[in-house]
């Protein structure tokens, strides 16, 4: 499979890509390890071979780029190659990133990490608990893919209305 061609990202797409980057920027240094970036591409549903991923990474870094880390501009270059118009596909990719242990659901700890990383202000444990209860429609203590899709769609609709 050839690497997809880059396209211009819209403001919302850039914001979403940067939220994902921020999750992997563990030390808030505006960099993420290349090894994590490769994992991010895989978790986001990409089926590139190791060679294709390395070619994309090399292109994103540029000729004098850091071989161990990737910055936000490089990450946005990568995002422009895989971002899709299809909302459900986009939501599913985000779910896979947030489902850190890959068990098909987002548990409280994963949800707490997300909510405290992507929000403008970190949420308290009580606020995270309340948000989890709201998102966990069937009350089984985890957020599955349909619940996550509903949560994201509700959030997008609320943002459009405000």
UniProtKB/Swiss-Prot annotation:
Q: Where does Ca(2+) 2 bind?
A: 136, 138, 140, 147
Q: List positions binding Ca(2+) 1.
A: 99, 101, 103, 110
Q: Which residues form the EF-hand domain?
A: 12-47, 49-84, 86-121, 123-158
N-acetylalanine: modified positions:
2
Provide this UniProt record's keywords sorted from A to Z.
Acetylation, Calcium, Cytoplasm, Metal-binding, Methylation, Muscle protein, Repeat
Q: Say where the protein is mainly found.
A: cytoplasm
Any one GO CC term of this protein is: myosin II complex
**Where N6,N6,N6-trimethyllysine occurs, residue numbers?**
96, 117
Record's CDD domains? EFh
InterPro entries tied to this protein: CALM/Myosin/TropC-like, EF-hand-dom_pair, EF_Hand_1_Ca_BS, EF_hand_dom
Protein role? The exact function of this protein is not yet known. It interacts with CAVPT, a protein also of unknown function, in a calcium-dependent way. This protein binds two calcium ions.
Task: Please give the name of this protein.
Answer: Calcium vector protein
Q: Which organism is it from?
A: Branchiostoma lanceolatum (Common lancelet)
